[in-house]
Design a protein with these regions (language model features):
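Conserved N-terminal phosphate-binding loop of PLP-dependent enzymes in the Aspartate aminotransferase
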Residues: 2-410
Length: 410
């Protein structure tokens, strides 16, 4: 990795970091709990902070850096498109958008060939919920306990965590939550009033909990019988993350609507609502997104799809994940309650709070995420090397040993 340009002329690395942290703290919204580091450069699976320290990024920027940081194909596509045309709203046609829509139709689950392009996963969920109400004429939306679908008001209504919801009550009326994996609860709840059921195939924020084939099949059948739509939120699990192009494909579950986001544009903001041709078009003027489908993001998304295809990254994710899950599972560590996940989406459920482990990993040059109070979540870029995963695995075991021995890891 090449040297990072200095933040301000004539200052040393520590002063640069202090400048960045102080400025952000002085002006930030306060919405985010921040780690005491300033990331200023990224390349592949690694990022560098303003003090010159390098870290293996097992967060992928919260799942966004699907191809790693500053992938050369993404950088080239952005530079080339930025010289031609950056923005073009959907009231006009555009070549990059047309190419992307055509390419999406080659990969999204069979029959899902209508798309609304937006800027985030939460926006995609909002669009999916509006589409469901519009198409069915019904109001009720069913979501799952422990589920996470975003923090905008509609998406937040489908999100379960009371910590996120309670300050903003009342939320969208007509949204109810059922127990994840409870077929009986689904059968009782899905009715002639239900517009849609929205689920994650693997709950991410809720602790990396995969749904069983039995549960998803039952919900799919109930939706079909009772005229409700099945919306699958694959914002985090889609595009190779779980070892298949889409997690629902690997399980043979056909959604009516699919939500995408995070890494689809290689790091630029993009979300997509995908739905079945049988549902028809949205009514003109019923929805919109000023920046959605802009040529710059579309060019980056096209480059992302190219790399996913050419390097067969979904299958690579499957192979790397299988090995990593096996290695973690075979360790039988006393602090580990359970290992869950698929592909390169892995949750290590600890018998204690996860925060000390996250801090310990940072001191060893590894960045990871929580998924609830006790789960250590790994979302490495799909281009991660086996040697890097080996290093991460070793660092995790070292940190857990220190915690188990009662040693100070700060």
């Amino acid at each position: 990795m090449t040297d990072i340009a200095q933040f301000s002329t004539g200052t040393t690395w520590p002063e640069i970091a202090t400048d960045i942290l102080a400025i952000e703290d002085r002006h930030t919204s306060g919405a985010y709990p921040k780690r005491p580091m300033a990331i200023v450069r990224g390349e592949g699976s690694r990022v560098r902070d303003a003090d010159g320290r390098t870290y293996l990024d097992m967060t992928s920027g919260q799942g966004v850096a699907l191809l790693g940081h500053s992938h050369p194909r993404i950088v080239e596509a952005i530079q080339r498109q930025a010289e031609r045309l950056i923005t073009c709203p959907e009231i006009f046609y555009n070549d990059q958008r047309a190419r992307l829509l055509e390419r999406l139709a080659e990969h999204t689950p069979e029959g899902l060939t209508r798309y609304f392009l937006c800027n985030s996963g939460a926006e995609a969920v909002e669009g999916a919920m509006k589409l469901a109400r519009m198409v069915t004429g019904r109001k009720q939306i069913l979501a799952a306990q422990r589920g996470f679908h975003g923090r905008t008001l509609g998406a937040l209504s489908a999100t379960w965590n009371p910590r996120y919801r309670d300050p903003f009550l009342p939320l969208l009326p007509g949204v109810m939550h059922i127990s994840y994996e409870d077929i009986g609860a689904a059968e009782r709840a899905i009715s002639a009033s239900t517009a849609a059921v929205i689920l994650e195939v693997i709950q991410g924020e809720g602790g990396v909990h995969p749904a069983s084939l039995e549960f998803l099949t039952a919900v799919r059948d109930l939706c079909s019988k009772r005229g409700a739509l099945l919306i699958l939120d694959e914002v985090q699990t889609g595009l190779g993350r779980t070892g298949a192009w889409f997690a629902c494909d690997a399980m043979g579950i056909q959604p009516d609507v699919l939500c995408l986001g995070k890494g689809i544009a290689g790091g630029l903001p993009m979300g997509v609502v995908c739905w079945s041709e049988s549902l028809g078009r949205m009514k003109e003027g019923s929805h919109g997104s000023t920046l959605g489908g802009n040529p710059l993001a579309c060019a980056a998304a096209l480059a992302t799809l190219d790399v996913l295809e050419e390097e067969d990254l979904p299958n690579r994710s499957h192979a790397l994940g299988e090995r990593l899950l096996k290695e973690f599972g075979g360790a039988n560590h006393p602090l580990v309650r359970e290992i869950r996940g698929r592909g390169l989406m892995i949750g290590i459920d600890l018998r204690q709070r996860v925060t000390p482990a996250l801090k310990g990993l940072m001191t060893r040059g590894v960045l990871a995420l929580p998924a609830g109070p006790t789960v250590l979540r790994l979302l490495p870029p799909l281009i991660v090397q086996q040697s890097e995963l080996d290093h991460v695995r070793q660092a995790i075991f070292e940190v857990l040993e220190e915690i188990n021995d009662g040693r100070d890891i700060d």
